[in-house]
A protein has these predicted regions:
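Charged docking surfaces used in two-component/phosphorelay signaling
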Residues: 11-19
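Short hydrophobic/Thr-rich beta-strand motif most characteristic of the beta2 strand and flanking loop
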Residues: 21-28, 36
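Conserved Asp/Asn-Gly motif in the active-site loop of CheY-like receiver
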Residues: 27-31, 86
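Active-site beta3 strand of CheY-like receiver
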Residues: 40-46
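Receiver (REC) domain active-site loop signature in two-component systems and cognate sites
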Residues: 51
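Short, conserved "switch-loop" micro-motifs in signal-transduction and mechanochemical regulators
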Residues: 66, 80-81
Length: 88
């Protein structure tokens, strides 16, 4: 699953992942992802940090609180490189 508010980033990630043989589910924000996650049960989730409405940290937290998806890897994507952001 790729969660990003940027259509360009979502589509680029989809192209690369499909070429690698992955099935890809796209979500435009955290709420969209939470609505789709139970139906698609992704094996890995790529999540942008900076999104409107529900940011990546909040989205990740909600995913991890669900026992069904607690072990699902969530890879956070960001252009931020500050120490605080890396530690978080």
């Amino acid at each position: 699953m790729v969660i990003d508010d940027s259509n360009t980033i979502r589509r680029s990630a989809e192209i690369f992942l499909v070429q690698a043989g992955c099935q890809v589910v796209l979500a435009e924000d955290g709420f969209d992802a939470l609505a789709k996650i139970a139906d698609h049960q992704p094996s890995v989730i790529f999540c942008d940090i900076m999104m409107p409405r529900l940011d990546g940290y909040q989205t990740c937290s909600l995913i991890k609180k669900n026992a069904r998806f607690k072990a699902t890897p969530v890879i956070m994507l960001s252009s931020k490189d500050g120490l605080f952001d890396r530690a978080r």
